[in-house]
């Protein structure tokens, strides 16, 4: 455990750490392909309950089935990013209030989504409930 904490600060500043992590995910997928199938099966149940996530899930699954390993390696960051965002959305749908889950989904998948705050349509997200929840703790 001490070694993990000792190396943690280095990981965030080490040049290329994001690429290394993404390539590690690809290696794990190649080494134990049944694990990604278990993960996708788990995502499928929840993703099917939301039209946006259902579409993203189908696209991600098609990408994994039709892309060769060299191309997957080239696009490792995009692939892992999609996996992570889908995992976050699935977990929020399962365990968070619906307005929180929907706010996250809209902020990541809507036509106006962006990497900064403020890229949503005003009526798409229950901002008042999200703020009330954040400040009531």
Regions found by a protein language model. Give the residues of each.
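Flavin-dependent oxidoreductase catalytic core characteristic
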Residues: 1-137
């Amino acid at each position: 455990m001490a070694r993990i904490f000792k190396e943690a600060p280095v990981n965030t500043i080490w040049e290329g750490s994001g690429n290394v992590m993404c390539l590690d995910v690809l290696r794990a997928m190649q080494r134990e392909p049944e694990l990604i199938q278990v993960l996708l099966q788990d995502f499928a149940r929840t993703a099917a309950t939301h039209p946006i996530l259902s579409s993203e899930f189908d696209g991600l699954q098609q990408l994994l089935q039709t892309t060769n390993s060299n191309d997957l390696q080239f696009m490792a960051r995009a692939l892992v990013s999609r996996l992570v965002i889908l995992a976050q959305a699935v977990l929020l749908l399962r365990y968070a209030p619906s307005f929180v889950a929907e706010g996250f989904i809209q902020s990541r998948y809507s036509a106006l989504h962006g990497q900064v705050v403020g890229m949503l349509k005003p009526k798409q997200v229950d901002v008042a409930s999200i703020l009330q929840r954040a400040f009531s703790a």
